[in-house]
Amino acid sequence: MVQLLTTASTQRPANPLTLPFVHLNLHFNPFGELPLKYRAKLAVIDTTPLLEHLARPRAVLQLIGEKGHGKTTHLLALKDCFSAASYVHFPEGKRPPVPEGNPLILDEAQRIPWWQRRQLFQRPVPLILGTHRDFTRQLQRMGRDVKTVQAGDKTDRQQLDKIVRQRIEFARRDPGPVPTVPLATIDQLLDQHGDDIRAIEGHLYDLFQHLERPCHVEM
């Protein structure tokens, strides 16, 4: 959980030496859970080929992947590319209302009841799906032009290094040294967790919780 710091009292400002993570020159742990609007802002995604597909008639972009592999981050980054887009997340066992949107972005589409899913798939707007299940055959039977992307399948050391650097810079407090994650640690994280970005962030969160000063972070 990311906690943004505020002044402790209108009478007396907080002693900066007692603020969390001030010893690391950070406002907060960079690898805690971020609000959705910041996840989109910090996404490291090449949206160009995805947007090119969505410009095609009856386009559907399908992002498939297990939990923690970046589906929702992709969806939120794409939402920011469209002023009229609508994003709907389907929690387990619930059916939230689905507004009009162009495109319409459906997160956890595998949880949508089949009859509602059929209705949504027939809407005359581009669709962007985050799903654990492949709906290609069903969509093609409806005449949709489907592009499928495996979320997280291109997470390599270069991309992960960029993600990590952006998160640390986002949490930076002032000019000066901050903790850094060397490529040797990036490689170890990929060896241990593969392309599970959420697991990597959790591991880094624990490492940063125990740092005493800005340094090279090692496993």
Where are these regions (language model features)?
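Walker A/P-loop nucleotide-binding motif
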Residues: 56-75
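Residue-level preference for the first positions of well-ordered beta-strands
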Residues: 60-62, 86, 103, 126
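Amphipathic alpha-helical "lid/sensor" segments that cap RecA-like P-loop NTPase cores
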Residues: 179-219
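AAA+/P-loop NTPase substrate/partner-engagement loops
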Residues: 84-112
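Sensor-1/coupling segment of RecA-like P-loop NTPase cores
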Residues: 112-153
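Conserved small helical "lid"/interfacial subdomain of P-loop NTPases
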Residues: 150-183
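P-loop NTPase Walker A phosphate-binding motif
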Residues: 71-88
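A short, basic N-terminal segment
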Residues: 1-57, 127, 206-219
